[in-house]
Amino acid sequence: MKRIKLLLILLIGGVTLTSCVVRNEIVDDGFSLNEYISSYDLWYVDYHRTTGSGEVPFLSRAFTISFLNGTMYANNNIVDIGKTGNGLGIAVGNYSTYGTILETRHDIDGYFEFDVVQLSNNEIRIDDLSQNVSYYLVGYQTDTFDYNMLFYENIEYFLQEFKAWERTDETGGAPNPFDNEHYLKFTHKNDVTFYSSHDPFGTNVDYINWDFEGSYIVRNVIGENNLKYLTLNYDNGDTEEFDLTVINDETIRLKHVSSRTTYIFSGIEFIQYLKAEKTNTTKPAVRSSGRKRTKIKRETVPKRK
């Protein structure tokens, strides 16, 4: 009889102790996760590392995500990043945590639940529990975020964020056919199509006649983080090669390889992707919700001599 009582006491005590341990771990983990994800101002969505066949729409649009006091923010544009919403972007929903679970409620895309795996001090993987997809996020503070990295790692998207690029300066070099190109356009319909125009400078962007069409390629350069090689392949068979650098968030420099001419292009009509109605941008803008990021694999080549 004593043995039975003792066994029951041990069993009950073990269950009670186990329950307490599990409950404490969940509470501690939940608090830690909430504290951890809000300890970084920005989480850069390293979309090129995404794995799986599923998709979370708001993460496919965002360059950065932020979690602050239950509100979720996103930067869906490269242009004006660091300015909109004091660097956090726009409010896009809310979130909560428990254990290792992150629950998000996006204003447009609805409810998603993620399991969060910490990979390093400032890097996490979030796994969608309802579909086969994982996203990789890297944490930064706004005052230490590498905006140059953002521009150059996502240069194709930056080129798409204006309805057109107007040539505003030309210096040096030998005369060449590209001197006649006054406007360029890179569409968000895919990541390879461009258009060009000989229309006079100052033409309203909605009335530009796009004379030529083709495909473009961006290549990484070994040892150069702030330089890309841009190739324009015209459908008529012509090819133009450039050294591409970003001057600021609305200006690019194209150095023509064969003629050594340097062209400056400025963006016209900034396209806001899923922005709030009231934003801090001073750029003339149109709004669009049609763009999602895709995984871009670039060739890396030696620097030209």
Per-range role (PLM):
Residues M1-L6:
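Positively charged n-region of N-terminal signal peptides that target proteins for export
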Residues V21-V92, I101-K305:
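Lipid interaction determinants
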Residues T16-S19:
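C-terminal motif of bacterial Sec signal peptides marking the signal peptidase cleavage site
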Residues I12-G13:
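Hydrophobic membrane-insertion alpha-helices, especially the h-region
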